[in-house]
């Protein structure tokens, strides 16, 4: 099942994101076969303010475990994380 993971950073925590970025990217590299795409949400001024990941997991519990162990989550970066099952429709 494909999941969209929508993460919102806590306000004023850009430095937390920057300090943990390499660990986060290394963590994602361990999910090469499951990671479809990922990237940051940006503010109007171009600062990173959240993350969106599209990933393939067997179960919602697998997606939750992935999120719980993300270095950004462990560093306390996120004010919220939403995990939503998703089905690609277009383009066909």
Residue ranges, per PLM feature:
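Conserved, structured core segments of small domains
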Residues: 1-92
């Amino acid at each position: 099942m494909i999941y969209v993971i929508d993460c919102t950073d806590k306000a004023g925590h850009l430095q937390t994101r920057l300090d943990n970025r390499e660990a986060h990217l290394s963590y994602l590299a361990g999910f090469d076969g499951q990671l479809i795409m990922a990237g940051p949400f940006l503010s109007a001024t171009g600062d990173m303010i959240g993350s969106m990941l599209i990933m393939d997991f067997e179960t919602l519990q697998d997606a939750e475990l992935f999120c719980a162990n993300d270095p950004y989550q462990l560093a306390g970066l996120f004010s919220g994380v939403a995990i939503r099952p998703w089905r690609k429709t277009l383009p066909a």
